[in-house]
């Protein structure tokens, strides 16, 4: 289990409370699909993913990105219990969707980039370290049900 200090929790929460989940979620998932095009195979039902502009403008990408980031909010509320928080999502992504767990790490790294672009100078090295620790812990929690 990962332990977060009070300072790390405060650093994560302070930015999260300022985040536009809908905007950042669509941007994060869109960026994942553009930068790592092999991840597109999990989103066949999303329609046109033929170019970066098609992906970033796709309403299904934006809607699912919001859903992903909304569930990430659960991580922030439950930083001391990530494994339990993501148990059902881990099972879904493992048993039904067959998502390569490496993709969780990629999405976490994309989220850190989104935070840096949105928050600029507020995204200090200390804040980045706290977020990097959180996205890594979430990726591990999501990969938990994999054999």
Curated annotation (Swiss-Prot):
Sites bearing Phosphoserine, chain numbering: 14, 51
Organ and tissue specificity: Red blood cells.
Globin domain ranges (all copies): 3-147
Keyword Metal-binding: yes
BP GO annotations: hydrogen peroxide catabolic process
InterPro entries reported for this sequence: Globin, Globin-like_sf, Globin/Proto, Hemoglobin_b, Hemoglobin_oxygen_transport
Superkingdom to which the source organism belongs: Eukaryota
Keywords: Heme, Iron, Metal-binding, Oxygen transport, Phosphoprotein, Transport
Binding site residues for heme b: 64, 93
GO molecular function, one term: hemoglobin alpha binding
A Pfam family hit: Globin
Alphabetical list of CDD domains matching this protein: Hb-beta-like
Family membership: Belongs to the globin family.
Oligomeric form and interacting partners: Heterotetramer of two alpha chains and two epsilon chains in early embryonic hemoglobin Gower-2; two zeta chains and two epsilon chains in early embryonic hemoglobin Gower-1.
Function: The epsilon chain is a beta-type chain of early mammalian embryonic hemoglobin.
Record-given protein name: Hemoglobin subunit epsilon
Name of the gene: HBE1
């Amino acid at each position: 289990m990962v332990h977060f200090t009070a300072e790390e929790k405060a650093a994560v929460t302070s930015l999260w409370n300022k985040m536009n989940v809908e905007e950042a979620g669509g941007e994060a998932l869109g960026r994942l699909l553009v930068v790592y095009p092999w991840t597109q195979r999990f989103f066949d039902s999303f329609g046109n993913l033929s170019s970066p502009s098609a992906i970033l403008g796709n309403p299904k990408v934006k809607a699912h990105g919001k859903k992903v980031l909304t569930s990430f909010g659960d991580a922030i509320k439950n930083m001391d219990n990530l494994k339990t928080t993501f148990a059902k999502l881990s099972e879904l992504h493992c048993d039904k969707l067959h998502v390569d767990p490496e993709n969780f790490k990629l999405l976490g790294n994309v989220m850190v980039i989104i935070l840096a672009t949105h928050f600029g100078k507020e995204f200090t090295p200390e804040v980045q370290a706290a977020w990097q620790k959180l996205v890594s812990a979430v990726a591990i929690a999501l990969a938990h049900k994999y054999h």
